[in-house]
């Protein structure tokens, strides 16, 4: 069941940014690591790897930038996540 929070609600009606590195995690490419699934920051379009990936670049991006929300960019998935409130939307 999808939930919401103020962060997810703030991005709900805004156009999504274009993915900066479609189809790949820039951090993994730079560091020579591999990703499991990809996520995209809804604030800036940074594409990063998920928490199941060794490097967890999406979470790292949140910690470094404070950008609170991301979405899955996996085919057939449209869910969003808020790192601040730990809510799936």
Regions found by a protein language model. Give the residues of each.
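Short cysteine-rich clusters marking metal-coordination/redox-active sites
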Residues: 25-28, 41
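Canonical RING-type zinc finger of E3 ubiquitin-protein ligases
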Residues: 33-42
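Cys/His-rich, Zn2+-coordinating zinc-finger modules
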Residues: 3-14, 19-21, 31, 47-89
């Amino acid at each position: 069941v999808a939930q919401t929070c103020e962060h997810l609600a703030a991005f709900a009606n805004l156009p999504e940014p274009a993915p900066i590195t479609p189809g790949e995690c820039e951090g993994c490419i730079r560091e020579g690591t591999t990703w499991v699934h990809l996520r995209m920051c809804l604030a800036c379009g940074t594409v990063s790897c998920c928490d199941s990936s060794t490097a967890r670049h999406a979470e790292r991006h949140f910690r470094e930038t404070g950008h609170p929300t991301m979405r899955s960019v996996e085919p057939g998935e449209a869910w969003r996540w808020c790192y601040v409130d730990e809510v799936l939307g």
